[in-house]
């Protein structure tokens, strides 16, 4: 059911401009996840030796991790949920039932929750969970 392809008219920039590139959206999210994972690994490695340089580099990696997790939350909330996911009663909705719509909301919410968890931790397992959630959600945005 979550394998729906969202094909709606509207705009990702809230104008609406009618320009969508859903595969690029999925690619951007996956790239952000790869960056988050790398940041987590780097923070772990740098924390083995605490000196001024490593503390500086860890701070930069923490900031990078935060920025990319925030980017994911923004993409999902502002692009996906505000522009692409429409209630099943909406004539532009890709969902055939309320249950499909609710499942899609849950899938998107799981990505946002996992992204926030990545902000809170440096455990690469959380990046893996984010990637898994994003792949599931991403099925809705890839060509059939």
Regions found by a protein language model. Name each.
Residues 97-144:
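Helix-rich interaction surfaces within compact, conserved domain-sized segments
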Residues 15-22, 48-62, 93-101, 120-131:
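Alpha-helical rod/repeat scaffolding segments in eukaryotic adaptors/tethers
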Residues 75-98:
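Short, solvent-exposed, charged loop/turn and helix-capping segments
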Residues 36, 40-79, 83:
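Alpha-helical segments in soluble extracytoplasmic regions
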Residues 25-32, 58-61, 65-68, 72, ...:
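Amphipathic alpha-helix face/heptad-repeat signature
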Residues 34, 38-41, 67-70, 109, ...:
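Solvent-exposed, polar/charged alpha-helical surfaces in well-ordered, non-transmembrane soluble domains
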Residues 6-53:
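Immediate post-signal-peptide N-terminus of mature secreted/exported proteins
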